[in-house]
Every structure is written in structure tokens, then in C-alpha cells.
Amino acid sequence: FKFDAGIEPKNSVQLIEKTDRELVKEMITLDKFIDVLIPRGGKGLKKFIIENATIPVIETGAGVCHIFVDESADIEMALPIIENAKTQRPSTCNSIETVLVHRKIAEKILPELTEMLLKDKVELRYSEEAFGIVKNTDFTHKENLKLATEEDFGAEYLDMIMSLKLVDNVEEAIEYINEHGTHHSDSIITQNIDNAEKFLNEVDSAAVYLNASTRFSDGGEFG
């Protein structure tokens, strides 16, 4: 049978295997054949399509996601959550780009966190204060430990790159995320229920998590 639109079910989903930019440029001008585009990919691809398409475009947002490690965080819990959120599939928009660490536990967590992520071959870009805590430690792949610039905070890397900075409290973390994030997915690692509730209520993101990875923001997990 056929639907009213005359489309056979077996042909309702089709795959274009070529991915070169010239083909994309041609396709996004076929307004006689394509009704709407929903681009998925990196910032460069989305910008290219928005600037060149003659077809209506539904723009999808970037994913600058954060994890805040609070003063009361269980460090043994925090480490694998951060590792999962950054390294499992870094090219996705629900992977984290920045970790915020409460200043009072920085000296306790940073050496172990840094060693873990450097072993995973993540390039780390630390704020000056955070960098100062670990700069004299002999890490594996220490060449990937670098000082961050202002451009790193708010950047969507979609790669094995992560920035990190220290904050004084949950209020500062919330303010930073709301200013530098893209309102996608953000998480707090804490044992303090008041700080957890404040973070979950005041971070203006589509998904906020307590003691969990931002990688849960996906169709399969949401059913």
C-alpha cells in the first residue's frame, strides 16, 4: 500500500552516502525537492548551512555542557562520571566541555583527575589557578596540560579537549554555567542536598543532573 502522500514505506527513509562539502552545498539549494533541513554536526557545518541554504532550516543548538564538582563531592564517584562525560564519545553535543571544581577541594581532586584524563589522552586547558596546583606534578602525557585562554571558557570542542576552572561556591558555578553554557545539559556532583536542589532549580538548561553524566541526554535514555 501507499500513504496518501504517495510515498512507499520502504522509501520513506533514504541515505546519502557522499559527505563532501560541494554535494552538501548543492543539496541545500534544492528547494523544489526538499521542504526543510535539520542540520546535525559541528558548529562549522551548521554555520555553513545557515549561510548558504535556500531551503528553510531548523537550527539545532550547540552543546557546551558542564560538570560542577562541589565541596562535598564523593571524589571516587566524581572521577568516573567526568571520564565518561568527556571521553566516551567526545564528538557528541552531550559530552562535557568544562569542569568547574570547588576551590576548597581542588588540591585534593586535581592531581588524580588530571592524571586520569591525561592517560585518556585528553588535552586539558586549566585556568591559571588550577594549573598552578598541578604544574609541578610529573604526569603521563604532561605535554597535553596547558593554560586556558578566555576563549576556552564557553567553547564547544567536540573533541578530546576539556577546560577546567575553580569556583568558590555553587552560586558562582550556576552563574558561570548560565552565562557560558548553551542550556543543553549540566551536572553537579555533591552530597549536599541543599546545593543539589539549588543547582537543579537554578541552572537554566534543558537537562540538569545530580551525580550523573551528561551523556544521559540522549534519545534512548529518554525513551
What are the residue ranges of the model-derived segments?
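Rossmann-like NAD(P) dinucleotide-binding subdomain of oxidoreductase/dehydrogenase enzymes
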Residues: F1-S72
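ALDH superfamily catalytic-core signature
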Residues: F3, L45-D159
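Short acidic-hydrophobic, aromatic-tinged amphipathic segments that line or gate anion-handling sites
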Residues: L15-K18, L145-A148, L164-D168
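Conserved acidic residues
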Residues: D35, E97, A206
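Residue-level signal for inorganic ion chemistry
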Residues: L37, H102, A173
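Short, well-ordered beta-strand elements within core beta-sheets of diverse protein domains
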Residues: V99-V101, D159-D168, H183-I188
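C-terminal core of ALDH-fold dehydrogenases
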Residues: E112, E175-G223
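Catalytic core of tubulin tyrosine ligase-like
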Residues: N169-V170, I193
